[in-house]
A protein has these predicted regions:
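Internal alpha-helical transmembrane segments of multipass membrane proteins
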Residues: 212-245, 249-253, 320-325, 607-638, ...
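Transmembrane alpha-helices and their membrane-interface boundaries in multi-pass membrane transporters
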Residues: 260, 277-291, 309-328, 333-374, ...
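Interfacial helix-loop-helix hairpins and adjacent transmembrane helices
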Residues: 1-25, 350-405, 409, 415, ...
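Extracytoplasmic
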Residues: 59, 63, 88, 132-237, ...
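Pore- and gate-forming transmembrane helices of large, multi-pass membrane proteins
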Residues: 244, 283, 296-329, 688-719, ...
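Juxtamembrane segments of multi-pass membrane proteins
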Residues: 384-522
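Hydrophobic transmembrane alpha-helices and their membrane-interface caps
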Residues: 239-287, 631-681, 713-714, 740-743
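Transmembrane helices with small-residue packing motifs
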Residues: 21-53, 75, 331-333, 398-431, ...
């Protein structure tokens, strides 16, 4: 019944060309309404879990201590940077940045109090603060004081004094695209300095920009490579035109639908357009190769289309199931990616079996008149290796399968954004400079909270001033000692750079107190007198909440550290906190973007394993239903399983971690492997002849595979490392899928006839 409907549909195209053409044009028109809404989402929100408990803690921390979104401007000069002229120019730059929309404040050397010109006692220091360009200061001495400062060293000046920094605190909105653009525009006008901009709030922005540039530049070159290679295969412009026009229609309609549905492209879904191009070209080649092969046998085009529809349908359905399973994830960008690919594959199927038949009615493609790539492979490899493969495939698999099961267990799950970029790029140099000289990039926050306490006021403690209060909460020596002890232990971790809290301010006060420890009275004085200025209060409120019961230790990770493992780092910090606060009333929470990124990675990894398991089982059931055979279902499932194993093993051997970008490669392996396996199995079981199968379905597989591999070789010239990895490992996956489908699948399928 279903086959008859399919046959009737293809037979009707000849008589209803205008009707079906109108459907395509209507689809293009409707989707065009959403083109302007299609966008890339560069917000940090795309890198967090929607229902993450740690995200709620992170938001609460932002409410209590202010937004933790910031950028860092690293400024260097070919000559001495700490001169009056340079400082005046940098103050001008600071003033311009402060008024940019999205910027809340800028912390720089101009906000750092100089307290040792002259150096006075602790009590007199409250009125002894001076500031660069506001007071007369000895600049070399001021520079050295900042370098030695427990607060400002590696915050606004490097330890060697050659690099100054602006910490640009942002206002907490969702998107900083225009803010980053405006800051970079201001930076370009200060050509006497070497200025690098980096920081967590622009990592996603730059990543998305690299992806955009790669899509435009390498996408165009890849399409050109596809065109040339396909022409060399088909020796006719018309089938090549059909393939690329169909891909263009599919991508245009899909992008329009994404815009209408408000599904933006994020880092997680950045390979969407490339995957859509792959699937579109694959199905088009299978259709045209079938029509061209059958043309030699005087089989009608409508009959050829009817025959190829079923394997294409099941290929599309298995792919849709695979991507639809991502909807079960709790990560919004992953859910959106699943929706995008599911809709894209469906639109690809509909367009391919609507546009291609219409194009063939307009002008059919030429029949094969000479030997092709399948003939070459059959005569120069397949025949010679057939006997060996028949004997060796089982022993080979017995050795190979345990290997590809074991090696992926050594895969690391880590996301080091600095590794995304080429060493010559601005963002890499900025992140490297900040990591080496200015205390690291990605922030971690440790929130420490004290319980309510009844404060007893001693009149003798009020001698400092009328408004003075006794030391309370974190300003008590007992609690401050605990804070300093924990911070000192955390600071010793190699993966962390700058670690900052109110304890750094107390260390500065101790220096002013002739390195004598501070008691409750001195701590109260520091709190109520030394930190009483408006500038000091603005800094203080980012480290202690208004109740003064909760305080924050702020740390930044050295993202360029070769030993960085965020998950292990968080566990190590947790152990330090447990050891110090076990049995006390002090509560602690570890939060910050570093924690949220890690949670996303761990969730991606676990959901990927679940998804792959679900997909492989689904493929097994669907293919078993299609072929009415459990053995065929197992055989087809076997191909993507090995392909995924090979790619993951390669990544393990090359020490390439699974991260936000590379984790989607497994989905590509499954998608392409299933495509090849179903088409080859369908034809092989029907023909029961290896040569005929290779020269028909095998030809389509070889054309598709080598075309995509050739196109992806272009990605090797990208400055964006995930694009390179995507091209390389997609190529490896496709190559192994071809080999396994053509050489191994017939051997496994032969088992059912024995």
């Amino acid at each position: 019944m279903f086959k008859k409907l399919v046959s009737n549909y293809f037979n009707s195209i000849k008589d209803r060309k205008f009707f079906y053409s109108a459907i395509i044009l209507f689809g293009i028109f409707c989707s065009s309404l959403g083109i302007n809404n299609f966008r890339f989402d560069a917000s940090s929100e795309t890198l967090i879990l929607d229902n993450d408990v740690d995200y709620q803690i992170y938001q609460q921390s932002n409410d209590d201590f202010g937004s933790s979104d910031f950028l860092i401007l690293a400024i260097q000069s070919p000559n001495e940077i700490f001169t009056l002229d340079n400082l005046q120019n940098l103050q001008n730059l600071r003033d311009k940045i402060q008024v940019i929309e999205g910027v809340d404040s800028v912390v720089s050397v101009f906000d750092a109090p100089i307290l040792e010109q002259p150096k006075l006692s602790l009590i007199k220091s409250a009125s002894n603060d001076k500031y660069l360009l506001e007071d007369e200061l000895n600049l070399p001495l001021a520079k050295q004081e900042l370098i030695d400062s427990p607060i400002f060293s590696e915050l606004v000046i490097s330890k060697d004094g050659k690099t100054l920094a602006f910490q640009i605190n942002l206002d907490g909105k969702d998107n900083y695209d225009q803010t980053v653009i405006d800051i970079r525009s201001e930076i370009r006008t200060f050509k006497n300095f070497n200025i690098n901009l980096a920081g967590p709030s622009m990592i996603v922005f730059d990543t998305i920009n690299f992806i955009k540039n790669d899509v435009i530049t390498f996408g165009t070159i890849t399409v050109l490579v596809f065109f040339i290679f396909l022409y060399l295969i088909f020796r006719d412009f018309w089938p090549v035109t059909i393939i690329l026009l169909n891909a263009l229609i599919v991508m245009f309609i899909s992008i329009g639908v994404m815009g209408l549905m408000d599904w933006p492209i994020s880092i997680v879904s950045s390979n969407f357009l490339a995957l859509l191009l792959i699937t579109s070209i694959a199905i088009s080649i299978h259709i045209l190769a079938k029509v061209q092969t059958d043309g030699d046998k005087n089989i009608s085009t409508s009959k050829s289309l009817s025959d190829i529809f079923m394997p294409c349908l099941f290929t599309a359905l298995t792919t849709i199931v695979g991507f639809a399973s991502l909807i079960l994830s709790d990560i919004k960008p992953v859910i959106d990616f699943g929706k995008m690919m599911s809709v894209g594959v469906l639109l690809n199927l509909l367009s391919s079996f609507l546009f291609i038949p219409l194009a063939l009615e307009l002008k059919n493609i030429k029949s094969l008149t000479q030997k092709n790539i399948a003939d070459f492979v059959y005569n120069n490899g397949y025949v010679q290796s057939k006997g060996f493969i028949k004997k060796a495939w089982i022993p080979f698999l017995l050795i190979f399968i345990p290997l590809i099961i074991y090696l992926p267990t050594n895969l690391k799950v880590e996301n080091k954004f600095i590794d995304y970029f080429n060493k010559e790029t601005e963002i890499y140099m900025g992140m490297e400079t900040i990591d080496k000289n200015l205390g690291g990039t990605t922030p971690f926050d440790i929130i420490l909270s004290l319980p309510e306490a009844i404060e007893e006021v001693d009149e003798e403690d009020l001698f400092f001033s009328e408004n003075s209060e006794t030391a309370k909460y974190w300003w008590k020596k007992e609690n401050m000692d605990k804070l300093q002890k924990v911070q000192n232990e955390v600071s010793k971790l190699d993966e962390l750079g700058k670690v900052l809290s109110i304890a750094n301010g107390i260390e500065l006060a101790q220096n002013l107190n002739n390195n004598q420890p501070l008691g409750d009275l001195e701590l109260a004085f520091v709190r109520n007198s030394l930190l009483d200025s408006e500038r000091a209060q603005k800094v203080l409120e980012t480290f202690i909440d208004e109740t003064e019961k909760s305080t924050k230790i702020f740390a930044r990770t050295i993202d360029s550290s070769p030993n960085l493992n965020r998950n292990e780092l968080i566990n190590t910090i947790d152990k330090i906190l447990q050891k110090n606060f076990k049995g006390t009333e002090i509560d602690y929470q570890i939060t910050g973007l570093g924690v949220l990124y890690n949670n996303l990675l761990q969730s991606l990894f676990s959901s990927q394993i679940k998804t792959l398991s679900f997909v492989l089982v689904s493929i097994f059931l669907m293919v078993s239903f299609l072929f009415r055979s459990l053995l065929v279902g197992f055989s087809v499932m076997f191909i993507p399983s090995i392909s995924v194993g090979v790619v993951m093993s390669s990544m393990s051997v090359l020490n390439i971690p699974l991260d936000i970008m590379t984790i989607t490669i497994a989905s590509i392996c499954v998608g392409m492997s299933v495509d090849y396996a179903i088409h080859f199995a369908w034809r092989y079981l029907k023909e029961n002849d290896e040569k005929k199968t290779l020269l028909s379905a095998g030809r389509a597989i070889l054309i598709t595979g080598f075309t995509i591999i050739m196109g992806f070789l272009v990605f090797l010239f990208s400055n964006f490392n995930p694009t390179i990895l995507f091209g390389v490992f997609s190529g490896i996956a496709i190559f192994f899928a071809m080999l396994l489908s053509i050489y191994l699948l017939p051997r496994i399928l032969d088992l059912q006839s024995k």
